[in-house]
Regions:
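Membrane-water interface segments at the C-terminal ends of transmembrane alpha-helices
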Residues: 19-50, 56-168, 196-223, 248-267, ...
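Glycine-rich helix-loop "coupling/hinge" segments at transmembrane-helix boundaries
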Residues: 119, 217-243, 470-498
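Conserved MFS/SLC helix-loop-helix module at the cytosolic interface between two early adjacent transmembrane helices
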Residues: 89, 93-94, 173-176, 180
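The alpha-helix within a helix-turn-helix
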Residues: 178-179, 432-434
């Protein structure tokens, strides 16, 4: 096969150009996303111009935002290194299940995680009861340490998975050679493991840092006063307590600049993770077979599992006892959340499919879908509020705007997964389909959708679960009649009805996991082609 001038095989370039799927859905989706994101940004920027310069409290919120994100990233990555190393060195029953559970906090509703952390680390939690029994003073969870604790709970599994992938990328033959040379664990760390860590750690830390900059719900529930206020929480307070739209716009611009800078840096620090070729054998670590190191790794894995699973167990335990305490508003809010989640899922997959089919021929189109990574949902919500407020009561649009923003926030994940699979389908089957004259709807129905079904199911489950637990834009727009389940839980916590909040938290956890399981299983069932 003769290469084309750009160095790619001619048949592959031809297939990429001749997918025979229309361009107009992708163009409309791109224009829609530009209007949805750039319009609110323009509104925020224009309003901020008349809102004056940031005051001392705004700079304090900026400093706290950066401080908690830095601490969260450093602690998460520092703890993830020994946990990932222990998982890389050991094989034990349930290891695969444990690694799978490391992904659970990603789809766990934030408000549910907060309830679990309060049950363990709060004033009446298990830890403080134990300290009181030992005659030691209680610990406080509210403030900087509470925010950092919650962020470590969410991001320790993510950092562990990322670093574990780096360990698994080291060829097993290198560890075999190290064992034949009699290398000690310290020498293996210095020669084999440290070069990998030096490559992987900066990217992992920056991703965690960027995620912690936009964690609104954690700061709202565990912030603990003006000294522990993030920029997003300050935006919320400017709306709900002062209704100072000018100051909210100024804060939104500060948040926008900070998040874009962090996202750009995280994307730039994306080093290659290849550490040489091998035969893809399972790693065996002869240098780590001493009783001391085996015990050390077992303790690390056990502590990490307890830290992650104990709050979830506490949610189930306390929630089961509080199910009968839930008011009728909780069930109404659950129905509202389900509707918002399903609408967001349909919107997200529709946009992702439209953009992915166009990105096959025009790769730059993928950038439209990735804009959601760099923009805080509260910034978009602020801009939409400024746009619609002169014409209509924003509370009337609360649920629709929430579903729309949730879809945009989940779009980068769905688009990336769908596009990668779509490229593989076209490169593998596209040439034959084109020769058979399969175009348009026929090609989509018989070639693409059956092979995309598992990815579509996983993407739908992820979007539905994330939307179900979102507590962001709805907090800006909603009134007493339009509350989602996370917002209703927050209101119950504010009224000190913790038993009812625990029951509602268990309901939210069950619904989120059920949505993810139903969509993911629906995508995998009968999907073999």
């Amino acid at each position: 096969m003769q290469p084309s001038p750009n160095g790619k095989p001619r048949w592959r370039a031809s297939v990429t150009r001749r997918t025979s799927l229309p361009d107009w859905p992708g163009l409309l989706a791109g224009l829609f996303l530009c209007a949805l994101i750039l319009g609110p940004l323009a509104a925020v920027t224009l309003r901020a111009g008349g809102g004056g310069w940031p005051v001392a409290a705004d700079w304090a919120a900026l400093r706290f935002t950066v401080l908690q994100a830095v601490l969260s990233a450093v602690i998460s990555v520092a703890l993830a290194v020994p946990v990932a190393r222990a998982l890389a060195r050991r094989r034990f029953p349930g290891r695969g299940v444990l690694i799978t559970l490391l992904g659970a906090p990603f789809i766990l509703p934030v408000i549910v995680a907060v309830l679990g952390l309060l049950a363990v680390f709060g004033r009446g939690g298990v830890l403080n009861d134990a300290l009181l029994w030992l005659g030691l003073p209680r610990v406080q969870i509210y403030g900087l340490h509470g925010v950092v604790l919650a962020h470590v709970f969410f991001n320790l599994p993510l950092a562990t998975r990322m670093i574990l992938q780096g360990w698994q990328a080291i060829p097993a033959e290198r560890f075999r050679l190290a064992a034949s040379l009699g290398m000690s664990p310290g020498t293996v760390l210095r020669i084999l493991e440290w070069p990998m860590l030096r490559t992987v750690l900066p990217g992992a830390a920056l991703i965690v840092f960027a995620l912690c900059l936009s964690s609104f719900a954690v700061a709202l529930t565990l912030g603990g006063g003006p000294r522990a206020t993030t920029l997003e929480l300050a935006i919320y307070q400017a709306f709900h307590f002062d209704f100072d739209l000018g100051r909210a716009a100024v804060l939104a611009v500060m948040q926008l600049v900070l998040v874009i800078a962090a996202a750009a840096l995280a994307l730039r620090v994306n080093p290659a993770t290849g550490f040489g070729a091998g035969l893809d054998r399972i790693q065996r670590r002869w240098e780590a077979e001493t009783p001391l190191l085996r015990t050390q790794d077992a303790v690390l894995i056990l502590l990490a599992a307890l830290f992650l699973l104990t709050p979830l167990a506490a949610v189930v335990w306390h929630g089961a006892a509080g199910l009968m305490e839930m008011p009728a508003q909780v069930w109404n809010a659950a129905a509202v959340s389900l509707a918002v989640s399903l609408v967001a899922t349909v919107l997200c997959l529709s946009l992702a499919m439209a953009l992915a089919t166009l990105a096959l021929r025009r790769p730059w189109v993928e950038g439209f879908g990735l804009m959601g990574i760099a923009i805080s949902p509260l910034v978009i919500g602020t801009g939409l509020f400024l746009i619609v407020n002169p014409w209509v009561d924003p509370a009337r649009l609360a649920l629709g705007v929430t579903a729309l923003v949730n879809a945009v926030m989940a779009l980068p994940f769905a688009l990336r997964m769908i596009l990668l699979r779509l490229r593989e389908i076209e490169e593998t089957h596209g040439r034959l389909a084109t020769s058979l004259g399969m175009t348009g709807g026929v090609r989509l129905r018989w070639l693409i959708l059956p092979r995309l079904r598992p990815v579509l199911g996983f993407s739908a489950g992820l979007t539905a679960a994330l939307s179900m637990g979102d507590l962001g834009v709805i907090a800006l727009f909603a009134d007493m009649e339009n509350a989602t389940l996370p917002l209703q839980i927050l209101r119950l916590m504010g009224a000190y009805r913790m038993d009812a909040a625990a029951g509602a938290g268990l309901l939210l956890l069950a619904l989120s996991l059920a949505l993810f399981w139903v969509f993911d299983k629906g995508g995998r069932d009968n999907a073999s082609v």
